[in-house]
Amino acid sequence: MVIELATITVIEGQEAAFEAAFATAQRYIAESPHSLSYALTRCIEHPSRYVLRFEWDTLKGHTDAFRGSAAFQEYRALLYPLYAAPPEVVHYNHVSLPAAG
């Protein structure tokens, strides 16, 4: 499993429009066979900033399969016009740690 964190800054004053657009666009993520889960969070200190956390089955499931799909083009068309700048997107792996105590 791969965790993707996308930091998104939307155009100031467009937060409600972005959240409404994401409510529509999330179906494209949910329908992807490579998507395991996702969550949209909004920054308290900077209300125009969001972090979108995804869990994908593999990195290629995200970067090749989802981003290369027609569904991604629809997703992008709904959300990207509301971005103040391109999102910062990074991928992570879980780190296995021994149990505490």
Where are these regions (language model features)?
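An amphipathic, aromatic/His-enriched active-site/gating alpha helix that lines ligand/cofactor pockets
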Residues: 24-36, 55-90
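Short, surface-exposed ligand-recognition loops at beta-strand->loop->(often short) alpha-helix junctions
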Residues: 10-18
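Active-site-flanking beta-strand signature of metal-NTP-handling nucleotidyl enzymes
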Residues: 3-8
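Short hydrophobic/aromatic beta-strand micro-patches
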Residues: 9, 41, 53-55
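Short loop/turn positions at the edges of beta-strands in beta-sheet-rich folds
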Residues: 12, 44-46, 56
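Glycine-rich beta-strand-turn "strand-cap" elements at beta-sheet edges
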Residues: 2, 39-51, 76-101
